Amino acid sequence: MAIKKYKSTTNGRRNMTTIDYSAVLTTKNNPEKSLVVSKNSKAGRNNRGLITTRHKGGGHKQKYRIIDFKRNKRDIFGTISTIEYDPNRNAFICLINYVDGEKRYILFAKGMQVGMKVVASENADIKVGNVAPLKNIPEGTLLHNVELKPGKGGQIARSAGSSVQLLGKDDDGKYVTLRLSSGEVRKVLAECYATIGEVGNEEYNLVNWGKAGRNRWRGIRPTVRGSVMNPNDHPHGGGEGRAPIGRKSPVTPWGKKALGVKTRNTKKTSEKLIVRKRSNKK
């Protein structure tokens, strides 16, 4: 993986960097037609047209690639035929050709190459791209696309450069302990499946977007501070010049306390499976 730097020919180019796709991707062709569906841009609106997620809108038109997060094709070998760009995520994807003729997209893991064979099996080899249940994976192994519920599909560690580490297994064999990239340590059912290795494109977080326009191409709109709004737009707004917010503590646009307020529901069932919270990682 390599980062491409640009000369300062314009203000927008100064300090701008991108991922060198030519060093990783194998094709500039269109994606597999059978695994592509249309995608309507919601621009952060719900079915009533009301904004439910701010700072979204615009951006380039995209088509959605159907990714196999379940990896439920058991004991059938597949060969990596291409490594492709996916506009819907910061990780790359691989096209897998299975011996029975079926094709599926999976997440690209660090170390994958065209021609490699991968398999999802109860006793799969501990090799990058293979899938196995957590109970059969040795301690210390780095994993991604980890299930939280057996058969539901991977939900943990799916973004670029992310991974979790298997720390240990319970004596009764029901749960295994994982350390997430956030520092959180939690238990997961040993029957859940996970993919061996780390997600690729690990240098994505080093990209300098260079100018606001590149974020607009991605569908990200500006984030405006409440203190520079009018009073009818935000509780922090109004006043002459740079006025203080006029409250004991900062609040959200809807008047609820912000910054430092715990928002997690302590009655969640998964609360008892969290051994160490990410806030206590030190």
Curated annotation (Swiss-Prot):
Keywords: Ribonucleoprotein, Ribosomal protein, RNA-binding, rRNA-binding. It holds the Pfam family Ribosomal_L2. The keyword rRNA-binding applies. GO terms for molecular function: rRNA binding; structural constituent of ribosome; transferase activity. GO terms for biological process: cytoplasmic translation. One of the primary rRNA binding proteins. Required for association of the 30S and 50S subunits to form the 70S ribosome, for tRNA binding and peptide bond formation. It has been suggested to have peptidyltransferase activity; this is somewhat controversial. Makes several contacts with the 16S rRNA in the 70S ribosome. Part of the 50S ribosomal subunit. Forms a bridge to the 30S subunit in the 70S ribosome. Belongs to the universal ribosomal protein uL2 family. This is Large ribosomal subunit protein uL2. It comes from Mycoplasma mycoides subsp. mycoides SC (strain CCUG 32753 / NCTC 10114 / PG1).
